[in-house]
Amino acid sequence: MFVPVGSEQDFPSVSTLLLPAISVGNVGQLAIDLIISTLNIPKVGYFYTDCLVPMVGNNPYETNEENAKELCTNAEVYALPSQKLAVLQLRSLVIKKKSKSFRQALVSWIKRCAFARVIFLSSCHAYHRDDKQLFGTPFRYLVTPALQKSVADVLSELEWKEMEKVSSYPELNDNEKKLFIPGGGFTKAFYNDCCLEDLQMAVVLKFCSEGDNVPDAFSLLNQVNEWLHLVEPTNGDVKWKSPRSWRLLFGSGLPPAIF
């Protein structure tokens, strides 16, 4: 599944892996773009898989004419050994009938690379919130039992809120509750897989709606940065660098000739 660029890629055993869900507003994917662009993380490989919709495009993080000619594919891995950080960017949809196969391959690769922890950036439909979720922070987190003990104090200090379970049958049986992440793609299934495989994994997500989700990506990343300290703030603010490809997120502007 993983094909290294050049020689076989070894990740430091204490590396943190960040990856996105393909979820509402593409918030996780946009946040991953910001991380790669800001830290200028080099590409170390890609995933060769038939579980994702095929795609190819120009280098989204180009900084000069030379690297502008590079191509990108649907799943690429970036690594920054100095910060013990690895990043997987997903750029196309998981084929529905192959979701389980993709998750299994992903879990297998994570175990083989022996990542110390996995941070999964996701989003969830805001209109599905219950009355309690309408108030306070729009961010939620989930951690697997394997990670719970080591991060419980930190997340409590940050005053993060855990994703609530909701009633399976509201107003009929409130005793039976389940995890519900509408619009979260394979977030719930991947979280359950990591629990079963005893992986140290956390989900950080934001309630949002479809539209211009760039502000959601910035805010989600600021939330994650409070915990991971990926970028140190300058004068109280973290300066994230948008990739140049974002100039085309909504196409070109209106031609002046039409006015």
Curated annotation (Swiss-Prot):
GO terms for cellular component: cytosol; nucleus. InterPro entries: Proteasome_assmbl_chaperone_2 (IPR019151), Proteasome_assmbl_chp_2_euk (IPR016562), PSMG2_sf (IPR038389). Degraded by the proteasome upon completion of 20S proteasome maturation. The keyword Chaperone applies. GO terms for biological process: chaperone-mediated protein complex assembly; proteasome assembly. Keywords: Chaperone, Nucleus. SUPFAM superfamilies: Cgl1923-like. The keyword Chaperone applies. Its main location: nucleus. It is found in: Nucleus. Belongs to the PSMG2 family. Forms a heterodimer with psmg1. Chaperone protein which promotes assembly of the 20S proteasome as part of a heterodimer with psmg1. PANTHER family: PROTEASOME ASSEMBLY CHAPERONE 2 (PTHR12970:SF1). This is Proteasome assembly chaperone 2.
